[in-house]
Amino acid sequence: SQQIGVSPWYWWADAPIIKHDAVYINNGVYTDGEPAVRYRGIFLNDEAPCLTTWVKNTFGTNYGGHEFYAKVFELILRLKGNMMWPAMWSWAFYADDPDNSKTADEMGIIMGTSHHEPMARNHQEYARKRGEWGAWNYNTNKDNLDRFFREGMERAKNTDDIITIGMRGDGDEAMSAEADTRLLETIVKNQRQIIKDVTKRPAKDVPQVWALYKEVQDYYDAGMRVPDDVIMLLCDDNWGDIRRVPNAKERKHKGGWGMYYHVDYVGAPRNTKWLNVTQTQQMHEQLTLTYDFGIDKLWILNVGDL
């Protein structure tokens, strides 16, 4: 459709649609070939108050519902993407509107959850019922957290979702000082057992990703490892600079490597929200570096509130 004058941004940015009296297509089959990156999409983040207010005024909901997400999914598809991490500051993609996940499946969008939302659960699902679930601490609250994780897998077992594994602290924070690689390896082991039990398939047959975001990369550098089928998701420094790339030995990891990249960031030591701080030249250079080092299984772009 873009070749006949329909911009991917025709709805979001009111991009004019070129009108034709007739459209002609040559006989035969034409293809651009497979995309260079298998899973590629966006992360809606830092969405309040701008996007949340706009959704309330446009769609009449206090959450991102399927009518809103259908527009986002269409944009992703028109931009040749196939994946998304949904907004999570105050919304819960799965719980707020059960038709959200159904719409993603119908439109061919592969869903995931962010680096601190394991096992297909949105953080708000925990935060809204903190009294029921108890402390976000695997050392002291293992049974409740395993139940929380299991419920997420029960809901996602018949989807194409990519399951985030591992665990960070409560609400996009580092884990407590007592956390160590042995605890995190135990968490991953138990999560994969839940995946196996719920799906009735070997865990290796269910796509999973481990995000080496912020302090989690330190665990990896200290020697923590996950099974060979898991996608290893490297990250930038939140301002568009790649922190590390896999060496020659690491590039043999069968699960492949991914990149989580920011053009929007809210956090210490400074925000980059609403600031055009990521130059296209820098982004091109850094992502070319990413691809050249074999990071081509999954790319996710944090676009803020879109």
PLM region descriptions:
Residues 1, 45-66, 81-92, 126-145, ...:
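The substrate-binding groove and active-site-proximal loops of carbohydrate-active enzymes
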Residues 1, 35-51, 55-62, 69, ...:
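N-terminal accessory/precursor segments of enzymes
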Residues 1-53, 57-78, 91, 170, ...:
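Solvent-exposed alpha-helical segments and adjacent loops
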Residues 7-15, 113-120, 203-212, 235, ...:
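A generic structural motif
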Residues 14-26, 88-89, 95-106, 130-254:
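Gly/Pro-rich turn-and-neighbor structural signature
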Residues 44, 85-86, 111-113, 165, ...:
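General beta-strand structural signal in soluble alpha/beta enzymes
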Residues 77, 82-85, 91-92, 99, ...:
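Structured mid-domain segments that build the active-site/substrate or prosthetic-cofactor binding neighborhood
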Residues 94-136, 144-149, 284-293, 303-306:
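Catalytic or ion-translocation cores adjacent to nucleophile or general acid/base/metal-coordination motifs
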